[in-house]
Amino acid sequence: MTKKIELAQIQVLFLGIWRFLLHLRQRLVEDQINIRAGHLAYVTLLSLVPMVAVTMSMLSAFPVFKGIRGQIEAFVYENFLPAAGDTVQVYINEFVGNASKGTAVGIAALVVVAIMLISAIDKSLNNIWRTKEKRSVVVAFSMYWMVITLGPVLVGASLVATSYVVSLKLFEGDALSGVMPLFIERLPLFFSVAAFLLLYMVVPNQKVKFWHALLGAVVAALLFELGKKGFALYVTKFPSYEAIYGALATIPILFVWVYLSWMIVLLGAEITAAMPEYLDYESSSDINETNLDGQPLAAQDTPAAQPETTSGQSTQVLETTGELAATAPQSTTLDKP
C-alpha cells in the first residue's frame, strides 16, 4: 500500500512538471523570445561602449575603487565574455578612452544610449510579465538613472568585500584551506544568481515572489555558466568564424554570445513569470485526481474544458501536439487566471 502511495505521488509530481513545461513552452512560443533576444543583442552592442564608459566614470569618482578597476575589468571580461574576452577588452578600452575625451554633449549622448539599453530591457521583461500598468516617465527615468549610477558602485563594493574576505587570516587554517579555492571558483555563479534575482524582482512593474524569482535566477545562472564553457569550447575547438572572418571574427563571436546570453536571461524570466500562473491553476484544480493523460480519474470520458481568456492577458494552453502524442495522448489545458 505504501509503495502504491509513493508511486502515485511520483506520478503526480511528474505530471505537474510535465504540465508546467507545456505551459512554459506555450509561453516561449507566444513571446517569441528568440526575436526579443536578437533585438536586445543589437541594442546591447550599440550601447556596450557607452555603458562601459559611464560605468568606469562612476567608479573613478570613488577613490576606493581606483585600485581595483583592473580587477573589475578582468572579472567582467573573463566571466561574461568567454573565449574572445582579451581581444574585446583591448578594443573596448580603446573605444572608451576615445569616448571619455569627448565634449559634454558627447558624454550626454553616451548616457542617453546607455539609458536606451536599460529601457529596452525594462520593456522586454514587462512584456513577459504581461504588465498593463506602465511606469511614469519620471519614475522610469529615476530607475534607469539609479541603475547607471548605483550599479557600478554595488559591483565594485561586492568585489572589494570579496577581496577583504579572501584576505582574512580566519581562512588560513588547515581545516579551511580547501574552502577558499572552492568559494572563489563558485563566485561567478553566486554573482550571476544575485544579478538575475535582482533583475527578475526589481524590473517587472508588479510584485514578484522571492522563491519564483530565485528559481528563475538559479536556472538562468546555471545555463549561463554552462553556456560560457560550451561557447568557449566551440570557439577554441571549431574556429569556423576565424577561418571565415579572419581579423574581424571578434565581431560575430561577440554578437552570437550576447544573443545566447539574452536567450538565457529571457528564459529565466519566462520561468519566473510562468510559476504563479501554473500554481494558480494547480490550486484551482484537483491535480491529484488526474492520471498521466491529464484526465480526471473519475471522469476520463469528460471532454477537456476549454480555456477562458481573461481581459488583458493571453490564454495559456498546455495542449499536446502530434510531437507529444506518444507521451501524452490526451490534450491538457491550463486556464490562466
From Swiss-Prot:
- Main localization of the protein? membrane
What are the record's GO terms for cellular component? plasma membrane
Q: Kindly give the Pfam families that the UniProt entry links to this protein.
A: Virul_fac_BrkB
Composition bias, kind Polar residues: at what positions? 307-319, 328-337
| Keyword Glycosyltransferase belongs to the record | no
Q: Where in the cell is it found?
A: Cell inner membrane
Q: Which parts pass through the membrane? A: 4-24, 45-65, 102-122, 137-157, 183-203, 213-233, 247-267
Going by the UniProt record, its keywords in alphabetical order are: Cell inner membrane, Cell membrane, Membrane, Transmembrane, Transmembrane helix
- Membrane topology reported for the UniProt record: Multi-pass membrane protein
Q: Does the keyword Transmembrane apply?
A: yes
Q: For the region Disordered, give the residue spans.
A: 291-337
> Which NCBIfam families does the entry link to?
PRK01637.1, yihY_not_rbn
Its family remark reads: Belongs to the UPF0761 family.
Protein's UniProt name: UPF0761 membrane protein Shewmr4_0316
